Design a protein with these regions (language model features):
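Beta-propeller-forming repeat regions
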Residues: 20-359, 368-370, 392-415, 431-440
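A short acidic-to-branched-hydrophobic micro-motif
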Residues: 374-392
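Generic N-terminal leader/processing signal
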Residues: 1-2, 104
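A short, aromatic/hydrophobic, helix- or strand-capping loop or linear motif
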Residues: 362
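Short, exposed beta-strand-loop hairpins at the edges of beta-sheets
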Residues: 422-426
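Sec-dependent N-terminal signal peptides of Gram-positive bacterial secreted proteins and lipoproteins
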Residues: 2-26
Length: 440
């Protein structure tokens, strides 16, 4: 996390160093009159200016893989790129600005505007391209921000024979393209949620000659307050599935949706309470392929005895990373996560149910102890971890006390000390280094 903040700050400083303030309008987008896009994209900018006929403000997508206001993509596979521009214009003084999508194509040696569509919107949330009807030509999916980020509308456009046709327009919170029913054709997976109304759902839509029709839908956890980007992957059984990390009032959960017997199902949710509790955990930890086996694992919390001495009776947890086959969560590995210092440690399976943890946030220490559940007492220390600032004099102090450096980054040094019992079990510095991971 610390590395991300530094990188982001450097990027912002670099942007301001490379460009003058006069290129920004009041809404921080680029006002082009005439266009100032340079290099290979300059002829496209000329075509946009000619088509627009006046001042316009380029609109950059706030999310997704495509972050440019002018996106080039070969949607029909003929080896020639098409360009898709997104901008706003005021039709006359005092009027609200309208948003445009402008398709610019190369005709012989020149670029020219082929088609435009106008919409009342404030910005672009994301852009995607996906062949939704199996004809070999990708549709253009545009998530429009209607009133800021509070309301979004997904528009699906087809561009064929020089014409841009809008196929659908509907509300969404998140969307992604995927082939969940394995029929060989991509569908649109749309999430809609309303924290205020507690009405959350997911639907799968198919593009036909008559437009976009709903194939399947199901309910999501009704108490969800925010939804992360859905991840298209597979169950451990190989069936296509969508993994959705969500924030609830009491933490985070993951819901996994897939098509079963011609229905979109969400087996991890309790249908009676309309809540998902099986994957409940602290916020900030999302599903991922934690062990690089090609299958997404879901983090599930497990209580662990705490040896922390504090006025607050803080509960401590280990994290079980579980694969899911559509019926059962199966633990693949267990880790002690230290989000404050930015690392996690994969625990030996031998320690399952036999350890306690000491958490000393002030001194950046985590220690694992052997624990007797019957007597509820801790025995000897197995492994101790400490995080020290890179140039801190305490680094040498800990080295003198028998600690060994595991790794370091641009900010901190991470050290460990292995107890006699752990050493007798075959745990050594190399073992610790192998199982110690910095969080991204």
């Amino acid at each position: 996390m610390k590395r991300r903040v530094l990188t982001a700050l450097c990027a912002v400083m670099l942007v301001f160093a490379l460009c003058g303030c006069d290129i920004f309008t009041a809404d921080t987008a680029e006002l082009l009159s005439p266009p100032e896009l340079s290099g290979d994209i300059s002829p496209i900018a000329d075509a946009i200016a000619k088509s627009a006929g006046g001042q316009y403000t380029l609109k950059y997508p706030s999310n997704g893989n495509y972050r440019s206001a002018v996106v080039q993509n070969d949607i029909d596979g003929d080896g020639i790129l098409e360009a898709f521009a997104f901008y706003s214009m005021k039709e006359s003084d005092g009027d609200a600005a309208n948003m445009y999508i402008n398709v610019v194509v190369r005709r012989e040696s020149e670029w020219a505007s082929a088609a435009t569509q106008k919409i009342v919107a404030g910005g672009v949330e994301r852009i995607d391209f996906c062949d939704l009807d199996g004809d070999g030509i990708s549709e253009i999916l545009v998530g429009w921000e209607i009133y800021g980020a509070s309301e979004r509308q997904l528009a699906v456009y087809s561009f064929k024979n020089g014409e841009l046709t809008q196929r659908t327009m509907q509300k969404y919170s998140r969307f992604v393209c995927c082939d969940l029913d394995e029929d060989g054709t991509n569908e649109i997976f749309i999430i809609k949620f309303s924290a205020a109304e507690q009405i959350n759902s997911a639907s799968v839509y198919k593009l036909t000659e008559g437009g976009v029709t709903e194939l399947y839908s199901c309910e999501l956890d009704k108490t969800v307050q925010s939804v992360a980007e859905p991840v298209v992957s597979h169950l451990s059984s190989g069936k296509p599935a969508v993994y959705i990390d969500e924030i609830k009032g009491v933490g985070a959960v993951t819901e996994v949706l897939f098509v079963e017997k011609n229905q979109l199902v969400n087996p991890l949710m309790n249908p009676e309470s309309q809540e998902t509790l099986l994957t409940l955990r602290s916020a900030g930890i999302g599903a991922r392929d934690i062990n690089n086996d090609g299958i997404i694992e879901i983090p599930v919390q497990e209580n662990v005895p705490s040896l922390t001495k504090s006025a607050v009776n803080e509960k401590l947890y280990l994290t079980n990373w579980c694969s899911y086959n559509g019926e059962t969560l199966t633990n693949q590995m267990t880790a002690m996560i230290n989000s404050n210092d930015g690392y996690y440690y994969v625990l030996s399976p031998k320690w399952t149910g036999q350890i306690a943890v000491l958490k000393d946030t002030e001194n950046h220490i985590r220690e694992i102890y052997r624990y007797d559940g019957e007597t509820a007492s801790a025995a000897d220390m197995l492994v101790s971890f400490v995080t020290v600032k890179l140039n801190d004099k305490d680094v040498q102090k800990y080295l003198n006390e028998g600690f060994t450096e595991i790794t370091r980054d641009e900010i901190s040094v991470y050290l460990c000390k292995i107890g006699e019992t752990a050493a007798a079990q075959g745990i050594n510095t190399d073992t610790v280094k192998q199982n110690f991971k910095l969080t991204e």
